[in-house]
């Protein structure tokens, strides 16, 4: 049996929605591969785009729990100032894995695991919607 949460699918859906709105930039990072310097570079570009063209940046950070609580501090001033909108995805309990200051500035959405039946229903609806 496999359990699916579809975090990556959610990121793709958000990315597609951002592409439809030309004033929003979407960046996806994985905390398993990225570091604080990668976030700093994204923030630098986000500040420039915000100042020059009022283009907003959404940062999707997959596996955000892989950043330790000190590393997570990098997000705070930029989330507070509105330079970035942070979407953090994790399979861990955010109450334990996220910095309290960051967590207090977030809304937590719990994505429940989908059963095989749920996935089958979703795929059937997608096939119908796409006329496949």
In which residue ranges do the predicted regions lie?
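Structured core elements
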Residues: 28, 60, 85-86, 108-110
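Walker A/P-loop
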Residues: 1-28, 44-47, 76-77, 81
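Conserved catalytic/switch belt of AAA+ P-loop NTPases
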Residues: 61, 65-94, 100-104
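Conserved AAA+ ATPase "SRH/arginine-finger" region at the nucleotide-binding site
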Residues: 30-33, 107-120
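Short glycine-rich substrate-engagement loop in P-loop NTPases that contacts/grips substrate
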Residues: 25-58, 69
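Conserved small helical "lid"/interfacial subdomain of P-loop NTPases
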Residues: 115-132
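Switch/connector loops and helix/strand junctions flanking conserved nucleotide-binding motifs
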Residues: 7-8, 36-38, 67-69, 94-100, ...
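Short glycine-/polar-rich loops that comprise or flank the Walker A/P-loop
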Residues: 22-25, 55, 81-84, 103-107
């Amino acid at each position: 049996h496999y359990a699916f949460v579809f975090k990556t699918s959610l990121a793709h859906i958000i990315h597609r929605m951002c592409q439809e709105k030309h004033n929003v930039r979407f960046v996806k990072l994985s905390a398993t591969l990225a570091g604080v310097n990668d976030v700093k570079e994204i923030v630098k570009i986000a500040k420039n785009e915000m100042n020059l063209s009022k283009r907003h940046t959404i940062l999707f950070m997959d596996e955000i729990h892989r950043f330790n609580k000190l590393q997570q501090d990098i997000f705070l001033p930029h989330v507070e100032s509105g330079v970035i909108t942070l979407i953090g995805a994790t399979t861990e309990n955010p109450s334990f894995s996220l910095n309290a200051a960051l967590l207090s500035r977030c809304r937590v959405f719990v994505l429940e695991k989908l059963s095989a039946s749920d996935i089958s229903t979703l795929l059937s609806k997608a096939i119908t919607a796409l006329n496949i």
